[in-house]
Amino acid sequence: MSSPAIGQPPIPPTPTDANISGKTVIVTGGNSGLGYEAARQFLTLGASRMILACRSIARGQEAASALRAHPTVKETNPNAVIDAFELDLDDYYSGLCFSNRVNAEVKELDILLNNGGQVVMGYEKSKSGHERSMQVNCYTHLLISLELFPLLRSTSAARGVPSRITFTGSATQIMQNTLSKQPISSESTVLGHFDDEANFNKLYRYADSKTVVNAYVRRLAALAPSEVIVNNACPGLVQTGIDKNLPFYLKLPMGLLRKSTGRTVEEGARTLIYVAVVAGTETNGKFLQHNQVDPLASTYTFAFPCYMERRPPECFSVSLEHGSKAQESLLAWNTSILRSFHGGGSAWRNTFNLALTI
């Protein structure tokens, strides 16, 4: 067992009675860091099928091979099926293709861990035309969550227990977001606000993206609370490579800080296993730190959560292009989306409606 991180509460071992035998798990960003370690721990708990969603299919396949060969997996779960599916979080179209493949090839889905993410220190546009860190950390994850929601619900109905959607969040959302000082104006949209380069702050955009994730979680959690538990957890300061894009004058001190006080990847991943496997319905719609629900995350009074609750669906509409100049709109809690959850089928075939309630 790894030693506890200095200055951070220790994360206890996953309970010995935690078991997900026969279950299917998807981990985005599953080829490295927290995603890879979370996948390993899911497998040691008995997951029968693991899907690593990775931008590079080659690196995903390498990670899948490494997991199959890992001593703990070979000992506890040698017959697990481990696959790598391509998913570029920078691109809505890739998210749609990934979701279509899962819906076509996967009959049951018990856990979706939305873990993939990055820190971007300069203003960049995604392949879908939005600010990159928001696209990667938020928007595409919400797309696949909604696309796979019917499958998660049907799996819950078949098993008689809730399925799970867990997001890797961050406590930076509490103190380092820009929205408390610079609220989204009533004339703007969420996409418009974060796409505006004038609103980009390289030191705080990661925190902003995690604030948006937390708001998504609160909304998604209301869709089918008895069937799909949706939650969000901060793994703490962890010894990963997420700082790779930082400038050298920040990368060096952050590296020293992570090395001296950060949790090991094994311990950090246990926080994700806790919310995705162990924690119950009391965590639906909640943000957790150190395996405890953080009450502040659901009682924020600054602009963004309030904005989310009052904005009509049409305020989150945007034109996208991919190949043909088709219009693809992001509409909040569109009734066709809600209907698709109940009636089966997808609302995204020609144009997709992303239920953001924003």
UniProtKB/Swiss-Prot annotation:
InterPro entries: NAD(P)-bd_dom_sf, SDR_fam
Residues forming the catalytic site: Y206, K210
Superkingdom of the organism of origin: Eukaryota
Entry keyword set: NADP, Oxidoreductase
Record carries keyword Oxidoreductase: yes
Database matches in Gene3D superfamilies: NAD(P)-binding Rossmann-like Domain
Function: Short chain dehydrogenase; part of the SOR gene cluster that mediates the biosynthesis of sorbicillinoids, a diverse group of yellow secondary metabolites that restrict growth of competing pathogenic fungi but not of bacteria. Sorbicillinoids biosynthesis requires the action of two PKSs. The SOR cluster is required for the production of trichodimerol and dihydrotrichotetronin, with sor2 being sufficient for production of trichodimerol, but not dihydrotrichotetronin in the light.
Similarity comment text for this entry: Belongs to the short-chain dehydrogenases/reductases (SDR) family.
Binding-site residues for NADP(+), renumbered to this chain: L34, D88, N115, Y206, K210, V238, T240
Short name of one Pfam family: adh_short
Protein name, UniProt field: Short chain dehydrogenase sor7
GO molecular function, one term: oxidoreductase activity
Pathway: Secondary metabolite biosynthesis
EC number from the UniProt entry: 1.1.1.-
SUPFAM superfamilies assigned to the protein according to its UniProt record, in alphabetical order: NAD(P)-binding Rossmann-fold domains
Positions of region (Disordered): 1-22
